[in-house]
């Protein structure tokens, strides 16, 4: 039995999140069915992922692992599994890893990118793939509010009531807000994220950007540790799992899908 890691990308618009659900069609369902077909239909295949994305959330870089007796070249895994996947899900790479590697528990950090379209009307060509705000936004105020969130904190004010995490303390290493033409690009990196944490952070930052709340409110909200005081959970459309960081001992290059994700913004929109 050997352990294989695979890197995935997917458009989450058509799927009810990553994780298998009793009455839903999920990315995990599709991937495990494709793996079973590639393996010859010898039984179910179980996978573990780096980050469980919600309904409508995308991935430019999702990492999974599975244990298997099947021996194939790396490129055979990529081409073979992709042959059984729908167009909105793709295996980008595959490689053997040691039994010490765990897609979820070995990860040092995850990075999410949120694409927000600023315009009078919603972006038809980005439907399902970008969030939308039609009100003017005070970006400097949003950046000031974002700085109050950096570091290790209890993020209870930004976790959903369905969150199953054992504790709400997370370390937010990065929260950048970049202007790219009509888009705002939010980049968030943390050791791990709570359920709906990114979308709740975006929702709160938009409250500040729209002038409904002050920069000081963000700090007070963080300290309150009460989700009921926070902003509504923002739409999933523009959210992408974009990078996973693992210790050097596992021999991965930087697993960052951000270059592919942000390539449309290079040049004319940069």
Swiss-Prot record:
Which keywords describe this protein according to UniProt?
Isomerase, tRNA processing
In terms of Pfam families, this protein maps to:
PseudoU_synth_1
Identify the catalytic residues: 54 (nucleophile)
Please, which domain of life does this record's source organism belong to?
A: Bacteria
Q: Which reaction does it catalyse?
A: uridine(38/39/40) in tRNA = pseudouridine(38/39/40) in tRNA
Instruction: Write out the residues that bind substrate.
Output: 112
Q: How does it assemble?
A: Homodimer.
In Swiss-Prot or TrEMBL terms, this protein is called tRNA pseudouridine synthase A
What is the organism field in this record? Bordetella parapertussis (strain 12822 / ATCC BAA-587 / NCTC 13253)
